[in-house]
């Protein structure tokens, strides 16, 4: 049995990455998001908690005594230096957790053909080499804002959609319905599953 084909989903805020990830899950892929991994680290890693308190103070802790994402976001998204520091703290840990997850999948008696991870800053942090295939999900800025994408300066740090599409193996312009996206993902899953099967021969 071959190892799962490693796929990354990337794209701008509000483009529909999480919706696409859920579709991949429905169609048989193992899935995890970078946000899920970060949430796990904030709640369970004492070294992360200590580093955050030393940098920002106890004000970033929530009522349960663990780092609160909204309080951290309030601090860092208006301070480029603080955001850079946070990314340098978390990205190596997220990468470690992701690789461990992928290794555990490969050890299963019947591993999935495809494992998919949502990585918003894939190209920005140079993580694309860790994946076999990259899927870019894009949508016009006005549509993403209508979906609730914040206008707090985060977009300024991201590569333009055009460049992401050029660098990705597959791209989808998400201007339609969730059902239309789901159909596209189903077709892509069939392609990826077949590719992994061929590679295993």
Regions flagged by a language model, labelled:
Residues 1-67, 108, 186, 190-201:
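Glycine-rich phosphate-binding loop of ATP-dependent small-molecule kinases
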Residues 15, 47, 81, 93, ...:
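Short alpha-helical
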Residues 36, 67, 89-90, 139, ...:
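Short beta->alpha linker loops
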Residues 36-114:
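ATP-dependent small-molecule kinase phosphotransfer cores
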Residues 98, 128-130, 141, 147-201:
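Small-molecule kinase domains that catalyze NTP-dependent phosphoryl transfer to phosphate-bearing small molecules
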Residues 99-147:
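ATP-dependent NMP and nucleoside kinases share a basic, alpha-helical "lid"
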């Amino acid at each position: 049995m071959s190892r799962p084909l490693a796929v990354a989903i990337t794209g701008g805020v509000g483009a529909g990455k999480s919706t696409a990830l859920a579709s991949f899950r429905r169609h048989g892929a193992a899935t995890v998001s970078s946000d899920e991994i970060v949430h796990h680290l904030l709640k369970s890693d004492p070294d992360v908690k200590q580093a955050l308190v030393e940098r920002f103070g106890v004000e970033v802790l929530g009522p349960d005594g663990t780092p609160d994402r909204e309080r951290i976001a309030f601090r860092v998204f208006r301070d480029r230096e603080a955001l850079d520091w946070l990314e340098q703290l978390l990205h190596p840990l997220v990468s470690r957790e992701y690789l461990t997850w992928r290794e555990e999948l490969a050890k299963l008696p019947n591993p999935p053909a495809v494992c998919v991870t949502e990585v918003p800053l894939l190209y920005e942090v140079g993580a694309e080499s860790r994946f076999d295939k990259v899927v870019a999900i894009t949508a016009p800025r006005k549509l993403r804002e209508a979906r609730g994408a914040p206008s707090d300066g985060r977009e300024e740090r991201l590569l333009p959609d055009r460049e992401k599409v050029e660098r990705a193996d597959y791209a989808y312009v998400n201007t339609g319905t969730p059902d239309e996206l789901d159909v596209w993902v189903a077709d892509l899953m069939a392609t990826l599953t077949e590719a992994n099967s061929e590679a295993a021969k």
